[in-house]
Amino acid sequence: MSNKPIADMIETIEHFAQTQPSYPVYNVLGQEHTYGDLKSDSDSLAAVIDQLGLPEKSPVVVFGGQEYEMLATFVALTKSGHAYIPIDSHSALERVSAILEVAEPSLIIAISAFPLEQVSTPMINLAQVQEAFAQGNNYEITHPVKGDDNYYIIFTSGTTGQPKGVQISHDNLLSFTNWMITDKEFATPSRPQMLAQPPYSFDLSVMYWAPTLALGGTLFTLPSVITQDFKQLFAAIFSLPIAIWTSTPSFADMAMLSEYFNSEKMPGITHFYFDGEELTVKTAQKLRERFPNARIINAYGPTEATVALSAVAVTDEMLATLKRLPIGYTKADSPTFIIDEEGNKLPNGEQGEIIVSGPAVSKGYMNNPEKTAEAFFEFEDLPAYHTGDVGTMTDEGLLLYGGRMDFQIKFNGYRIELEDVSQNLNKSRFIESAVAVPRYNKDHKVQNLLAYVILKDSVREQFERDIDITKAIKEDLTDIMMSYMIPSKFLYRDSLPLTPNGKIDIKGLINEVNKR
């Protein structure tokens, strides 16, 4: 039986609270909370929020990790007509402070201890939230988030300058959710059993909670005490009865460091959903070997177009024949085009910037008209967004990714795509993972290319010195890379830094190399 689109997120959650009140919606390391719990707790908290007399539709910050109280608070805020701004409890203080400055929230709900002192914004803590749950207040839903009202606001993790708050409306959310639960590429089962690992402050989280709540499924998550310790994390993850794994490819790469991450130990896994960064052929091949019968979905899209705008199930033929995986068939309701520098549409097969239009495109950045005007525009009478990504559309309607426009550099007259260099580095038999980073001179021209490298196990035992390893890697690469693309310096590391969202922190490495 195929899934049906939903008309309203809160009405759908209410429906499941009536039809399956004792079915688990949230499981934190074996501790279950049901759809009935979610309804009564969110109703009771919504009643308390209404009594605070906050300005109508004003945004509210919710600070915490993956606790059940986070989800119940989000639902309560939606019922009471407020957009929520999730901030992860591991966020840097400067980031938390910058978000408060931009967002000017009417309230902070701190599920985890709030790290900033002397905040003028009113605050509710975890004990008060739990006390509100215990009151068991009834609640009549008369002024929920609807239509073009903001449902959530997610701040992108810019490494420089002020973070930008992407406003996602209820209509935006429905466009994404209904595509995901009805799309043949995702093939999302009813009552999905989903891993809820990416933090709520990262819009990849919407890829697990939206379809799960829309289809009456269960979210499985882990307390932050465990997620901070990789050994504990993977010992716990392997015991979860999940069917769908949603994460960045980097997180799956980390999981594959464990020999237990395979279909024998985790026989329940039927789907992998990837988004947030590029899924390489190498990672997908390794995953296919570990989980030969699982469906691997490569999805793509910016936060500004509500999580994702395209998706494709990776086939064995793709893995055998392609150097770079396609990023998917685009959503039917979201016309996606390739344009040139003058803004003209390009024919299939030609490379340009990917722009997306339609009902999933955000209304813009919160309280930031300047940045909104730079990135958002109207295209053929539809709201549209400049992704800043390079791409090509095939005649079959598949979108191909060509890297970030801001990760394209000019070196010795050649235009070089940093992600191309990184992908080729990863083909070396000596390399487990690598990224290419430019070093600039004082005139901001690229002086040379560096590579940060994690070596495969036992490589060091084969060579006496790092210089010998570098020589062997360069010999490995001469057949597959132009000489001007091969980095001149190789820096060997045990690990590469990740952003709070689980992506390799390329911008951070660029800043490190250039001592910014």
UniProtKB/Swiss-Prot annotation:
Keyword line: ATP-binding, Cytoplasm, Ligase, Nucleotide-binding
EC identifiers of the protein: 6.2.1.54
InterPro entries hit by this protein: AA_adenyl_dom (IPR010071), AMP-bd_C (IPR025110), AMP-bd_C_sf (IPR045851), AMP-binding_CS (IPR020845), AMP-dep_synth/lig_dom (IPR000873), ANL_N_sf (IPR042099), DltA (IPR010072), DltA-like (IPR044507)
First-tier enzyme category under EC: ligase
Entry binding sites for D-alanine: 203, 307, 503
Gene Ontology BP term (one): lipoteichoic acid biosynthetic process
Pathway(s) annotated for this protein in UniProt: Cell wall biogenesis; lipoteichoic acid biosynthesis
Coarse class of the protein's main subcellular location: cytoplasm
Catalyzed chemical reaction(s): holo-[D-alanyl-carrier protein] + D-alanine + ATP = D-alanyl-[D-alanyl-carrier protein] + AMP + diphosphate
Cellular location(s): Cytoplasm
Binding site for ATP: 156-157, 298-303, 389, 401-404, 503
Highest taxon listed in the record's lineage: Bacteria
NCBIfam families: AA-adenyl-dom, D-ala-DACP-lig, PRK04813.1
Entry protein name: D-alanine--D-alanyl carrier protein ligase
Organism whose genome encodes this protein: Streptococcus pneumoniae (strain 70585)
Taxonomic lineage of the native organism: Bacteria, Bacillati, Bacillota, Bacilli, Lactobacillales
